[in-house]
Amino acid sequence: MGRARPGGVLAVEDADLEGLFCDPDHAGFSFYQRMYAEVLARHGGDPGCARRLVRYFRDTGTPVPQVRLLQAVSTGGDAKAMPLLTLEAIADSIVSAGLATADEVTAAIEDLRAFTARPDTLVSDPRIFQVWARRGADTTPAAR
């Protein structure tokens, strides 16, 4: 918050991967969820960081932040393909990290492709946390 000018706003948005879900439950979707979180963690990310953003704001002495939670859920169309596209994009990272074999990843991709193509399924995107706070007036002697 030190970089925000008095009256300025600090805003942060992050995805919470631990909130992913589908209906009905599906092994290919669960594989995608586990692999996405693991690949992110191995690259220094934190799959559950977003839900702690409010605490991070408070820990820095930031005024009480505002928070908004968004989560898209799809029953059809292009948005429903996001898990499949993500799994395809991280396939090489999964294999190179030794998390699964190329054959296992290929099978999971095909399984997820069939699942997301079904009209009777529901698929979520990660929850998106939006957190923001306004910096109060600067009361340091130099600012007076």
What residues fall within each predicted segment?
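A short glycine-rich, Lys/Arg-flanked "PGG" loop and its adjoining helix->strand segment in the class I
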Residues: 1-9
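Conserved adenosyl
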Residues: 6, 108-110, 144
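Conserved catalytic/acceptor-binding region of the Class I
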Residues: 9-78
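A generic alpha-helix surface/boundary motif
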Residues: 34, 51, 88-89, 127
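Short beta-strand
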Residues: 47, 123-124
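Amphipathic alpha-helical interaction segments
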Residues: 52-55, 107, 128
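C-terminal helical/coil "lid" or tail adjacent to the Rossmann-like core of SAM-dependent
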Residues: 60, 64-123
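Core SAM-dependent methyltransferase catalytic element
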Residues: 60-63, 83-86, 126-144
